[in-house]
Amino acid sequence: MTEFEFGGFSCRAEGSGGTLALLFSGFDRELFADVGGILAQSCGGVTLAEFGDIDWDRDYSPWEAAGTNGRVFSGGADRLVGFLPDIVQELSRRYGEFSRVYLCGYSLGGLFALYSAAVWDFPALCGAASCSGSMWFPGWTEFLREHPIHGDVFLSLGGKEKNSPDPMMASVEEKTMEVKRIAERTAHVVFRNEPGGHFSRVPQRLARAVEYLAECK
């Protein structure tokens, strides 16, 4: 794992290969290492990278919105989207040019990955993955109908996530299926039903998403 500072962000990357998977899961070093360890055994042609530090409710939310129990999403995603061309260029300088780029996120990071795929026009961007993604985010499905995603889309969700006591989050399964139907109009979409709840086997879920997108499995 290589760690470095670039563009005002802390960054980390590991692996080598012509496929880049950018991870959006809160800039957690241990989680990144776990995902990288799995991919090192199964997906040798992938460079895994991420950047932070991250405030989930600010940086991964595409617009301002109110959650439950006073939670506030401040809509800072566009700042990170604007950084994507720069970090890809810097990673290309360090690791060589990438023929394919994928965006892979967890929870609100999954929402951010799909949002970025819808608004970022980049020739090498081939798709995105949302694992246990916050598809319940206010206004998201309406936005997606007007801003199509292309390429490959991987969606996964834990079977118990719909049992959340939070009424907004409890709609996640219904909303994820709605996102699947919308995205299928313009993209190749795969959905995987995972066992457990929102925090079950997170590294494995993210690694499976990368493996699918990078055609390692």
Regions found by a protein language model. Name each.
Residues 7-94:
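Serine-hydrolase catalytic machinery in alpha/beta-hydrolase-like enzymes
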Residues 42, 123, 146-150:
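Short, conserved loop/helix-junction motifs that constitute active-site signature segments
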Residues 76-84, 108, 171-172, 201-202:
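Phosphate/oxyanion-binding active-site loops and adjacent basic polyanion-contact surfaces
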Residues 115-126:
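Conserved hydrolase catalytic core segment
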Residues 132-213:
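The feature captures the conserved acid-bearing segment of alpha/beta-hydrolase catalytic domains
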